């Protein structure tokens, strides 16, 4: 999965959940891209799960 795929997935999930504002959604996508670039998959999973409300 590419960096762009992760960003799009995060945006779709956040939007579908309806719990995240547009500003927060964009900030999360940016953070996700940064951590993906640093290749820290554990942190990405934790942050993604937290953002999705699971």
Annotate each language-model stretch with its function.
Residues 1-54:
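Catalytic phosphate/metal-binding cores of nucleic-acid and nucleotide-processing enzymes, i.e., regions
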């Amino acid at each position: 999965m590419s960096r762009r795929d992760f960003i799009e997935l995060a945006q779709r999930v956040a939007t579908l959940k309806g719990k995240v504002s547009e500003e927060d959604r964009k900030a999360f996508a940016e953070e996700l891209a940064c951590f993906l670039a640093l290749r820290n998959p554990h942190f990405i999973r934790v942050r993604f799960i937290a953002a999705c409300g699971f």
